[in-house]
C-alpha cells in the first residue's frame, strides 16, 4: 500500500477561496524520488456534461482520452485550438459508447494523430464507424492494446492495464490507462464495472494512483470498495452532467469515496478541472470559481473485517459486521482469501 500524508495544507477550507489545491506526495524512505526536468504534466478534465473527455499535455506533446458526445465536437476542437495543440501523440477511446467516442471523429478530421487506440475495431453505431473511418483517412488503423503495453508522452509514462478478459458488456471492455509522471500518477478506467474491476485486481497490477477518474460517471456499477482500496487515490474526478437522468453520481459511490477519504471533484459542480503535476506536487484549478469540493476527513489505515464464525470478510463500513469478539482484521484482500475467508456479497460483491 502506498504511504500517504496530507502535506496538502489540508484543510481545504484554507485554500478554497483561491480554488487551488496543492498536494505533496511522499516516497518510501529507502528510495530516492524520481526527478523530471520537463515542463510538467497537465491533465484537463473537460466539462462535457454526461460524458468523458480528458486532454493530457506533457513536454510539448498531447493526447486525448475519450471525446465526449457528438454534440461536444465543436467544444472539443475549440478547446484544442485554445491550447495551441497541433498534433496528438495518441487518441484513446476507452470504449465504443457514444458519450466517450462522440467527439473523436471531429478531432481526427482536423488533427493528425500518431496512434489511435480502442478496445475494438468494430461496433454497431454510426459514431464509432466514423471514428474508425477518420482514423483510416489518416493512414492509420485502430490499435487494440494489450495489458502492459506502454508509450511515452514526453516524460510521462502511459501504461495500459486492462481489460484483462473478453467481455460482452461494452462498459467492461473499457481500456484502463495509468499515467505516471515523476512521483505522481493518474488512473483512467472509462466505464469499467465491478466485474472487470475484480478481474483486473486478480492479476495484481500496480493500480495505485494519486488521482482517479472515477469510473462510469460515479455509477454504483463501478468503484467497488476493494477497487478504491487498492487504487488508494487522494482525489477522485467525476465527469458527470448536472441533473442527469441516471442519478449519477450515485449516493452509494459518493459515500464510498467519502469513507475512503477521497476528495471528490465533479465537473457538474466545478466545470472543467485542470490538474498540473511537476512530478512531486499536483495543483488543481477549476472553472467555476464560486464552487469548491467538499472537505473530507483523511482515511485512517485501511483494512477488512473478518467474521471468525462465518469465515466471511467485510469492508469496515459494512452494516453486517460481526461482534467485536468475533472479528479478525486483514490489511489485504488477498490475505483474507488465503486464510479461507469469503468476501461479503453485500459490501465487496
Predicted regions and their residues:
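Short aromatic-glycine-(Arg/Gly/Cys) micro-motifs in beta-strand/loop hairpins
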Residues: 307-323
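Immediate flanking context of iron-sulfur cluster ligation sites
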Residues: 307, 336-338
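Non-globular, low-confidence helical/coil segments that flank catalytic cores
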Residues: 2-5, 16-300, 320, 326, ...
Amino acid at each position: 500500500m502506498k504511504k500517504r500524508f496530507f502535506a496538502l495544507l489540508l484543510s481545504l477550507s484554507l485554500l478554497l477561496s483561491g480554488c487551488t489545491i496543492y498536494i505533496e506526495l511522499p516516497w518510501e524512505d529507502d528510495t530516492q524520488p524520481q526527478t523530471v526536468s520537463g515542463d510538467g504534466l497537465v491533465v484537463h478534465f473537460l466539462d462535457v456534461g454526461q460524458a468523458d473527455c480528458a486532454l493530457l499535455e506533457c513536454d510539448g506533446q498531447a493526447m486525448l482520452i475519450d471525446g465526449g458526445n457528438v454534440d461536444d465536437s465543436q467544444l472539443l476542437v475549440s478547446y484544442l485550438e485554445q491550447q495551441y495543440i497541433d498534433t496528438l501523440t495518441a487518441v484513446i477511446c476507452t470504449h465504443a459508447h457514444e458519450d466517450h467516442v462522440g467527439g473523436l471523429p471531429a478531432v481526427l478530421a482536423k488533427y493528425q494523430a500518431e496512434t489511435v487506440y480502442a478496445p475494438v475495431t468494430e461496433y454497431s453505431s454510426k459514431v464509432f464507424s466514423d471514428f474508425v473511418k477518420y482514423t483510416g483517412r489518416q493512414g492509420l488503423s485502430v490499435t487494440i492494446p494489450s495489458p502492459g503495453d506502454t508509450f511515452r508522452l514526453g516524460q510521462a509514462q502511459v501504461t495500459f492495464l486492462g481489460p484483462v478478459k473478453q467481455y460482452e458488456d461494452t462498459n467492461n471492455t473499457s481500456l484502463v490507462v495509468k499515467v505516471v509522471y515523476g512521483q505522481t500518477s493518474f488512473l483512467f478506467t472509462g466505464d469499467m464495472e465491478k466485474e472487470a474491476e475484480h478481474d483486473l485486481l486478480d492479476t495484481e497490477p500496480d493500480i495505485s494512483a494519486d488521482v482517479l477518474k472515477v469510473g462510469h460517471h460515479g455509477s454504483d456499477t463501478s468503484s467497488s470498495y476493494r477497487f478504491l482500496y487498492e487504487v488508494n487515490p487522494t482525489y477522485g474526478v467525476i465527469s458527470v452532467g448536472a441533473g442527469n437522468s441516471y442519478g449519477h453520481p450515485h449516493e452509494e459511490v459518493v459515500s464510498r469515496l467519502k469513507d475512503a477519504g477521497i476528495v471528490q471533484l465533479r465537473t457538474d459542480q466545478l466545470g472543467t478541472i485542470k490538474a498540473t503535476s511537476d512530478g512531486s506536487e499536483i495543483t488543481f484549478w477549476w472553472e467555476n470559481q464560486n464552487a469548491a469540493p467538499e472537505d473530507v476527513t483523511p482515511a485512517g489505515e485501511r483494512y477488512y473485517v473478518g467474521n471468525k464464525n462465518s469465515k466471511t470478510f467485510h469492508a469496515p463500513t459494512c452494516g453486517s459486521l460481526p461482534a467485536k469478539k468475533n472479528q479478525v482484521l486483514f490489511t489485504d484482500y488477498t490475505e483474507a482469501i488465503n486464510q479461507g475467508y469469503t468476501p461479503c456479497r453485500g459490501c465487496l460483491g
